[in-house]
Every structure is written in C-alpha cells, then in structure tokens.
Amino acid sequence: MTDTPDPAAVSSPAIKAAVLSEALPYIRRFHGKTIVVKYGGNAMTEERLQRSFAHDVVLLKLVGLNPVVVHGGGPQIDDALRRIGKQGTFVQGMRVTDAETMEVVEWVLGGQVQQDIVMMINEVGGKAVGLTGKDGMLIQARKKLMANKENPQEPIDIGFVGDITQVEPAVVKALQDDQFIPVISPIGYGEDGTAYNINADVVAGKMAEVLGAEKLLMMTNTPGVLDKSGKLLRSLSAQTIDELFADGTISGGMLPKIASSLDAAKNGVNSVHIVDGRVPHCLLLEILTDQGVGTMISSH
C-alpha cells in the first residue's frame, strides 16, 4: 500500500526549489514568446480555479512570456438568456444567434465577463486590458453559414454568427510591448458595423496563427480528448483527428475546438494543447514542467 504524502513535506522548501529548477529551462526557452490561452469551462466559474488561472497568467508575464487570453462565456450567456425567457440552441457546436441573442452576447462577453477577468488579473498583480473585435479593427468578420450534410445545396443559417475574415494584431502587439495582458472577447464586426458572435475556440486559434504564437492552450472541462472508452489520448495527428470526426468520437462543442487547434498547428503555431481547466495551475503545468497535462495536437 502506498503511503499518503505528508502535505507539509510536499510543500517543503526543497520541493518548491525543485519545481522552480524544473521550470527554469522552459522559462529560458519561451522568454519573449507569445502564448495564447482559450479561457473557458469550469475554470471560469469556480473561484479557486479563477484565482489559479489569474496567478498563472500573471506569473507567465512576470517571467518574460507574453500571454494573450481569449475567453468564452457560454454558461454566463445561457444564464442571461434564461432571465429573459430564451433558451440557447446549437448547431454543430455553434450557438444559434438571433438579433436579441446577439445583444445579450455583446453585453455578457464584452461587458460582464471580460471585465471580471480583467479585474481578477489586475487584483493579483497583472496589468490586463479588455478588447473586442471592434478595438483597433482587431477581428473583422462576415456572416457564417453552416454546412448542411443532408442538403449541401442549402447551408444552415444560424443568425449573427461570424467567420473571421481578417485579424489586425497591431493593438495586441502594442499592449504586449507595454507589458499589458490582452483579454479578448470573441466578438467580430462586419464592414457595415454588424456585430457577430464568433466561437471563442476559433478566435483563439486564429489569434495564435496571426501573432505567431509559440503555444496555443485550449482549456476545457475534460482531461483532454478522450476516445470512445473514455481513455485520454495524449497526442493526435491530423489523420487521427479526421477519423475521430468521422466516427463521432469528437462531437458537439469539441468540434470547433479541435478543428481550430488543428488549423493553428498547420499554420505555424509550434505547440497546440487541449488542457484540463479543472486542474489548478494547469497553465504552469503545461508550459513550465516536463509532465504537462492534456492532449497535444499535431499537424503531421
């Protein structure tokens, strides 16, 4: 039988020193590099995980990395919709967004959720600034039509949901240069000023590509990508992903997450990971330790 570790021993100065020593080569390797984090799931709704996330982001910035946060907010949007008597519906993992829902999305993501994240990071010593797609023309978009498997000639209209047409990273780079931590809401804007709801995983993937990020980390509510038996898949190739799409192993909200991760890997992001946001300090574990957590996505 294995003895239960003594908590005092685990938190001893020697253990802490060993952890710092393990992190040093990673700090050196990733110094000055951009790390894009898709922040969502339980990590956004449980206080201990919120604080863990904020501390991780601030520490990464303090040791010389450049974290960029792209946040979701699905549960918060659902709560706001319920208060006005609406229920959210989804097609292929994308939220159907009529005009009234779009107003709620803008208010929740660009206001309440974003400001909560900014304040949380600032309270633990960071300097965070909130952005939406409108700021500096950051995220330009057009209406998205979903593929209709039953009738390919008639795509599915899901309302004010957008496809990204262009990302202008200048405002993000300027904030990074001035030691700020950008916090980006996944709202894009069309040429006529129309606001579009864009899946946060898609925004995170595209932001990582355009910024030339070293790493893209997608936080989720599972240990990573699981096979049909519930076993964690430590790494996924492009071919394996196609197979998992085809047999339905990857479905629902995981579809845009994996598709965006694979696109990022194919377009120059050196390392893409699906990480378990329920694990405290999952960002530090993935970036600054030998072990890491979750599933690595490869374009090969």
UniProtKB/Swiss-Prot annotation:
GO CC terms in record: cytoplasm
Give, as in the UniProt entry, the pathway in which the protein acts: Amino-acid biosynthesis; L-arginine biosynthesis; N(2)-acetyl-L-ornithine from L-glutamate: step 2/4
Q: What does this protein do?
A: Catalyzes the ATP-dependent phosphorylation of N-acetyl-L-glutamate.
NCBIfam families referenced in this protein's UniProt entry, alphabetically: argB (TIGR00761)
Localization, per the record, is: Cytoplasm
The record, for Pfam families, names: AA_kinase (PF00696)
Q: Which UniProt keywords apply?
A: Amino-acid biosynthesis, Arginine biosynthesis, ATP-binding, Cytoplasm, Kinase, Nucleotide-binding, Transferase
- In which organism is this protein found? Bordetella petrii (strain ATCC BAA-461 / DSM 12804 / CCUG 43448)
Recorded hits in Gene3D superfamilies, A to Z, give:
Acetylglutamate kinase-like
Q: Which residues bind substrate?
A: G73, G74, R95, N197
Keyword Hydrolase: yes or no?
A: no
Task: Show the catalytic activity.
Answer: N-acetyl-L-glutamate + ATP = N-acetyl-L-glutamyl 5-phosphate + ADP
* A biological-process GO annotation: arginine biosynthetic process via ornithine
Supply the name of the protein: Acetylglutamate kinase
Question: Family, per the entry?
Answer: Belongs to the acetylglutamate kinase family. ArgB subfamily.
**Gene Ontology MF term list:** acetylglutamate kinase activity; ATP binding
At which residues is there a site annotated Transition state stabilizer? K38, K257
Q: What EC designation does it have?
A: 2.7.2.8
User: PANTHER family per the record?
Assistant: N-ACETYLGLUTAMATE SYNTHASE, N-ACETYLGLUTAMATE SYNTHASE, MITOCHONDRIAL
